[in-house]
Amino acid sequence: MSKYAWMYRLGIRPWERYGTAAAVGIAALIDREERERSRPLGRALDLGCGRGQYTPELERRGWQAVGIDNVPSVVAEAADRDTSGASYVVGDVTDLPAADVGTFDFFLDIGCFQGLDAGQQAAEGAGVTALANPGATLLMLAFGPTRMRSLLEGVSMKAVERAFPLWDLVSVDPAQTRGLGWPMNRSRPQWYRLRRTPPA
């Protein structure tokens, strides 16, 4: 059983706490994505969707939303709870082409990438790149590196750039920490926005 499967079984879901605490800020960032696009918005992939905290909102906003996670019971729960019409797939973010989910215009990663080792991060980056339509964007939340690696996973900006070499880093914005509590409020979380680099 994977680490995340155990955490879900034990009811340890700190990433959901962040989503609740930062809901307004997350909505504003997705608003920004949508202002730069014409309708229809296109397809969106929620990487490491868990119990579907964000996937339904993407669907309600007008995206054709798909959530992907490698914990089958959690994907089933997300699908059962969803009333938006979004789709859910059991799959591995480090082997996205194998999930056979098609291509996408927007990728959302809230805390998934940071839980992977360097090799897995590179694999996620390669998979996202393979599934990205021209002009696709990626919005990623990741905690910064800390001395508390055993308690709180985190990544550096260099790690993000290394995993997505064919993407332009458009912006890096500090994420709010209010309401998170220790140790997450010491982690310097950042929002990374990337855009697929046009072919030469």
Please provide the spans of the model-predicted regions.
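A conserved beta-strand element that flanks and buttresses the S-adenosyl-L-methionine
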Residues: 108
